Curated annotation (Swiss-Prot):
GO terms for cellular component: cytoplasm. Belongs to the glycosyl hydrolase 3 family. NagZ subfamily. SUPFAM superfamilies: (Trans)glycosidases. Transmembrane segments: none annotated. Plays a role in peptidoglycan recycling by cleaving the terminal beta-1,4-linked N-acetylglucosamine (GlcNAc) from peptide-linked peptidoglycan fragments, giving rise to free GlcNAc, anhydro-N-acetylmuramic acid and anhydro-N-acetylmuramic acid-linked peptides. Its main location: cytoplasm. This is Beta-hexosaminidase.
């Protein structure tokens, strides 16, 4: 079954967490900065999780820039929004750089037996401060082109790609971590602008996963996208033809609170079409779901376990020391150039 992705409180797995991880509805864990003191400790933490449930999907938000959970012992990945400016607007060069950044990010996580980074961000940079330089560009075609190459780099390391935040978070000012963003634009406006990177990458079959936004598009549907069967089924599945895994964003965020407590949020997300739901930073919420929620009896139609890292491909990628080292230097150069602009 395995519909839930939970987190861990610290540097080791507690007795309570060990019991929770053994629950059949837990299909994955998401790691945060608090779980990583250094690379060796992180590897031991992952090993301990694997000893409990070897098949769990282990994920992290490791996009680059300000959203990079692991730093000690890891290369600092530049913000995606710095790549094109650092290339002085040369899209061909920026695409090459984006591919190497995707490879670098993925290969270093896979070296620690971490399956997945929730990346890339496909939001088009607009007025959202929480997105900002997490986005590749303010131009949809540039987002599509750079994200496509970033994904190729990820795939060459052995990692699947999860695009976020569908259908686009860049055109709302509010931060869904602490508020409920409302986007009043029409369906035609959203489709012509924000949705273009998703449409392009789904059309080229390069997205294995999608994470929807906790944003209400008030002139289109009353529910936030992550709780909307219109957005997830009618648009994402049927209109765009997406056949991968739909992850909810964190059900602990303010943008999810409209659905009530965690039981209500989980039901709303699953009913809308999410295949795996995330609950972060709330062990009480996780416990409530594992003990009180009426989970679906059937397996998810699109199982998140299909996104586990390709270990054989990762091993080959890890042998590419020259590429890895060149990518590390490139990442530093991009950040240095961007800071000088």
């Amino acid at each position: 079954m395995s519909y839930l992705m939970m987190d861990l409180a610290g540097l080791t797995v507690s007795a309570t967490e060990t019991a929770q991880l053994q629950h059949p509805q837990v299909g994955g864990i998401i790691l945060f900065s608090r779980n990583c003191e250094n690379k060796n400790q992180l590897i031991e933490l992952v090993k301990s999780v694997r000893s409990i449930r070897p098949e769990l999907l282990i994920a992290v938000d490791h996009e680059g820039g300000r959203v990079q959970r692991f730093r000690e012992g890891f290369s600092l990945i530049p913000a995606m929004g710095d790549i094109l400016p650092a290339a002085k607007g040369d899209l061909t060069l920026a695409k090459q750089w984006a591919k190497e950044c995707g490879f670098l990010m993925a290969v270093e996580l896979l070296a620690c037996d971490i399956d997945l980074s929730f990346a890339p961000v496909l939001d088009v940079n607009g007025i959202s401060e929480v997105i900002g330089k997490r986005s590749f560009s303010a131009v949809p075609d540039e987002v599509s082109a750079l994200a496509q190459q970033f994904i190729i780099g990820m795939n060459e390391a052995g990692m699947a790609a999860v695009g976020k935040h569908f259908p686009g978070h860049g055109s709302v000012a509010a931060d869904s971590h602490i508020a409920m963003p409302v986007d009043p634009r029409t369906k035609e406006q959203v489709e012509a602008f924000d949705m273009q990177p998703f449409k392009h990458l789904i059309g080229s079959q390069q997205l294995q996963g999608v994470m929807p936004a906790h944003v209400v598009y008030s002139n289109i549907d009353p529910n936030p996208a992550g709780f909307s069967s219109y957005w997830l089924q009618t648009i994402l599945r049927q209109q765009l033809g997406f056949d991968g895994v739909i992850f909810s964003d964190d059900l602990g965020m303010k943008g999810a609170s409209f659905a009530g407590n965690y039981l209500g949020r989980a039901k709303a997300a699953l009913d809308a079409g999410c295949d795996m739901i995330l609950v972060c930073n709330d062990s009480v919420g996780v416990n409530a779901l594992l003990t009180e929620f009426d989970w679906p009896a059937a397996e998810p139609t699109h199982t998140a376990l299909s996104l586990k890292g390709n270990t054989a491909q990762a091993s080959q990628a890890l042998e590419q020391q020259t590429r890895w080292q060149a990518a590390q230097l490139l990442a530093m150069d991009i950040t240095r150039i961007a800071q000088s602009l």
